[in-house]
Regions:
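Non-catalytic cap/lid and distal C-terminal segments of serine-dependent acyl enzymes
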Residues: 1-148
Length: 148
């Protein structure tokens, strides 16, 4: 398992944006490592960033035995919505980020292999994105989120 922090250019956001990711190691002795990895897009709450999950949780330890790529994008205070100022966070989460993962990691994603989840504001973003893109996300995790 490896943890990376980096910057990618987003067309949906019209800017460079930060992204953290956990990638399974090449050590395939783990039981769950048959086939390609699944994808989890994991979103932070208000006031957080792409560093929040890796800094304040045990996400690395929990995902280590799994064949799972975890993308933790910085969604700022957007609630994961497309905004009138052109910052299209929902498009970024539902379209651009899964496409980026497919190209970067050579994945063939479908709704059975792609999950979106988040805490608080990130949970709001996760459920709204999952409902907007039901063909992309087969699972959605929501932790302590406002749902209105």
């Amino acid at each position: 398992m490896a943890l990376f922090h980096g910057v990618i250019n987003s067309k949906a956001l019209m800017k460079d944006t930060t992204l953290s990711m956990i990638v399974p190691s090449d050590d395939r002795k783990n039981i769950g490592f048959q086939g390609q990895p699944q994808l989890l897009i994991l979103l932070h709450g208000a006031g957080g960033s792409n560093y929040t999950w890796s800094k304040y949780s045990s996400i690395e330890r929990y995902t280590e035995p799994l064949n799972l790529i975890v993308l933790m994008p910085n969604i700022e205070f957007s609630f994961g919505l497309n905004m009138s100022n052109g910052l299209n966070y929902q498009s970024y989460l539902g379209e651009e980020l899964p496409q980026w993962a497919e190209k970067t990691f050579g994945l063939k994603l479908d709704r059975e292999t792609t999950t979106i989840a988040g805490q608080s504001m990130g949970g709001f973003a996760a459920i709204h994105t999952a409902l907007a893109y039901p063909d992309k996300f087969g699972k959605c995790g929501v932790f302590s989120a406002p749902l209105a």
